[in-house]
C-alpha cells in the first residue's frame, strides 16, 4: 500500500467523522450548516480598526459601562483552542485574521458547544464587542455565534502548508486557503488586468476573445501506423 493510498484512506475517515459531527449538530443543536445569508457583516480588517482602547479600559474598570463598539464578522476557522469555559479561535477572510473569544457565560449553551468543537475550515459568523484579551490580543468577545458552513474536507497541514506544486496550480482555492501570499498575488494580478482593461477601453479599443484551444476534440481522427525500433529490432 503506497503512502498516497494511506493518505487517501485517512482523509476519507476524516471526512466521514466530520459528516457524523455535522449530523449530530443538526440533531442536537439545530444548526443549518449549508450556508445562509447574513446581513450587516464587515471585514475583519474593518473590525480590527474599530477597536477603542479607551472604551476597553473603561469596561475593565466598570463592566456596567460598556461603550465598546459592536461588530458582526464572518470567516474561516484557521486556529482553535477550547479551554473549559472559554474557547478561542482565529478566523480569516480576504483582509486578514482576527481572534474570536467565546465565553460559556456570554452566549447560549448550544452556540458555545458548537464553538468549542469546531473543525479547521469551518466558516462561522460571530457578533460581539471589540475588546482585548489578557495577553493583549485584539479580539471579538462574541455573545452570538453561528456556524455558517461546515467544512467536510480536511485542510492541508497547518505547518507544512501545500507543498504539491501541481495541486497548487490545479486547485487554486486550496492554495489560497493556505497562503496569504497567494491571495495578495491574485489581488495584484486582478488589479493590474482591470487597470489595463479600463485604460484600453477608455482609449476606444475593443476587447475580442480569441479561442486558444481547439474546441473540437480531434483524438478520434488519428490514424494507426507502424514503426520500427532499430536497436531492439522490433
Language-model features, listed with the residues they occupy:
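Class II aminoacyl-tRNA synthetase-like tRNA-binding/catalytic domains
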Residues: 2-28, 33-234
Amino acid at each position: 500500500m503506497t503512502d498516497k493510498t494511506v493518505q487517501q484512506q485517512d482523509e476519507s475517515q476524516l471526512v466521514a467523522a466530520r459528516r457524523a459531527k455535522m449530523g449530530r449538530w443538526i440533531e442536537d443543536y439545530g444548526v443549518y450548516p449549508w450556508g445562509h445569508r447574513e446581513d450587516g457583516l464587515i471585514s475583519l480588517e474593518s473590525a480590527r480598526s474599530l477597536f477603542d482602547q479607551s472604551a476597553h479600559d473603561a469596561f475593565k474598570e466598570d463592566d456596567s459601562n460598556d461603550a465598546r463598539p459592536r461588530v458582526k464578522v464572518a470567516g474561516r476557522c484557521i486556529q482553535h483552542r477550547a479551554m473549559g469555559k472559554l474557547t478561542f479561535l482565529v478566523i480569516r477572510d480576504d483582509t486578514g485574521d482576527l481572534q474570536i473569544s467565546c465565553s460559556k457565560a456570554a452566549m447560549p449553551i448550544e452556540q458555545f458547544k458548537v464553538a468549542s468543537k469546531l473543525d479547521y475550515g469551518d466558516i462561522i459568523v460571530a457578533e460581539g464587542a471589540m475588546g482585548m484579551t489578557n495577553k493583549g490580543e485584539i479580539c471579538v468577545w462574541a455573545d452570538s455565534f453561528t456556524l455558517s458552513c461546515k467544512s467536510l474536507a480536511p485542510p492541508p497541514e497547518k505547518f507544512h502548508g501545500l507543498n504539491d506544486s501541481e495541486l497548487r496550480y490545479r486547485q487554486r482555492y486550496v492554495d489560497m486557503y493556505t497562503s496569504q501570499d497567494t491571495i495578495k498575488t491574485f489581488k495584484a494580478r486582478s488589479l493590474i488586468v482591470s487597470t489595463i482593461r479600463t485604460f484600453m477601453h477608455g482609449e476606444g479599443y475593443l476587447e475580442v476573445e480569441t479561442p486558444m484551444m481547439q474546441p473540437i476534440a480531434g483524438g478520434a481522427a488519428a490514424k494507426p501506423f507502424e514503426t520500427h525500433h532499430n536497436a531492439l529490432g522490433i
